[in-house]
Amino acid sequence: MKIGIYGQFYHANAAQYIGQLLELLDQRNIEVLIEEDFLKLIHSNNKIEKDYKHFSAFEELDNSFDLFFCIGGDGTILKSINYIRNLDIPIVGINTGRLGFLATIQKEQIESTLEELLEKKFSLSPRSVLTMQTNPRSYDPVFSHIALNEIAVSRKNTTSMITVDTWLDDQYLTSYWADGLIISTPTGSTGYSLSCGGPVITPDADSLVITPIAPHNLNARPLVIKDHTTIKLKVSGRGKEHLVSMDSRIATLQNDTEIIIKKAPYTINFVELQGDSFLNTLRKKLLWGEDKRN
């Protein structure tokens, strides 16, 4: 068996759990590769002397991996998908952060669930992801990535609104007068889009949602569309530039640049343990439908 491990930060409260995970994997003679920068953090903060194999880019991985552990919060998981892309490696999120909505398990559950994971007693939850291109082409490395949650455009260096002209499959939809616009996947519907009044969409829905950010229009409401729709955006405003984000990655574009957003031709597989489900997570972590009468 072969496992990849990725993390962004090394928190003192997670040290024992990282050590525990590595020890349990070593006891089972499992081949482990750790992302290079995270391995350096482990060596400098933990009394782990073993020199693990490492990786630093998508090109160094392949589909021979059985599992990919992400240690951290939701932000860590969002960044990890760009190491996996179309390799179909199942992701196991180990939450060492706060809410950890996307995580498979909490850090305290490592020992109790590891055998279940290694024996593959789980199902997979495929998640759609987004790609983006620009015209004229931007060579910012941000645009070579994929987004699991959302792609958003927003104003930059101004308190004035921007205007976001929007087309769906080359058919004009409308021009949003707002602070920005979010194009969200079902996975991202519980994130930024939700904060801006968007609906919750189950991960298996073949949909995307377009959610305006603080629109100055009583008729501008979130819109659910088919996920095979090609979305084209063009921003204008008092400033010359605007921001574009792909999950946690941000870049600057000149106004009037065409932004083309599509669903990627592959999905990212999240591990779902027996007894777990999106609806259970929705109730437990976001307190969905919380009512003292229930």
UniProtKB/Swiss-Prot annotation:
UniProt key word S-adenosyl-L-methionine: no
A cellular component annotation (GO) from this entry: cytoplasm
Active site: D74
Main location: cytoplasm
EC number: 2.7.1.23
Biological process annotations from GO: NAD metabolic process; NADP biosynthetic process
EC top class named in words: transferase
Enzymatic reactions: NAD(+) + ATP = ADP + NADP(+) + H(+)
Pfam families: NAD_kinase, NAD_kinase_C
GO molecular function: ATP binding; metal ion binding; NAD binding; NAD+ kinase activity
Biological role: Involved in the regulation of the intracellular balance of NAD and NADP, and is a key enzyme in the biosynthesis of NADP. Catalyzes specifically the phosphorylation on 2'-hydroxyl of the adenosine moiety of NAD to yield NADP.
Listed name of the protein: NAD kinase
Organism taxonomic ancestry: Bacteria, Pseudomonadati, Bacteroidota, Flavobacteriia, Flavobacteriales
